[in-house]
């Protein structure tokens, strides 16, 4: 992420909208790929790993949107998109670390990674369950936690985009808003399944 930002804003001779469009499209495709694969995982660590791919895609989409706005001299929207992207990077580092600690605790206690063989751990591991609930709600993007704030700010960056004097960019940004909303909804489903099966389901 840092390298892409430095190359895009410091090493390239000028900010190019097409480069932002490429990053935006690749980021959205990566996010969709990650969340779809996370939804079908039965291994809890693989599920979190694909969720990380989804969130990295969101970060690249945010960087791409920032570059597009900068290329068309939309300074306020570029600042909003960049702030949302960096905040989401910080958020992801926090709640994903927490969730990997939770899965590590579950694995250490049960010697089991398969979601189909876990369940009902709220009774035997209440502290881990409550910490896992915080991480799950944050990564699912539910208010008022940090994951909601960063994803909402990024979605606002898409929604408040004015008409841009470039046809492809004008088409890509509304599609990007729809894909981001769909990815966020699927991510919420994935994380509710993750938490519900491990801590609330029948063993």
What are these regions (language model features)?
Residues 1-203:
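Hydrophobic transmembrane alpha-helices and their helix-loop junctions in integral membrane proteins
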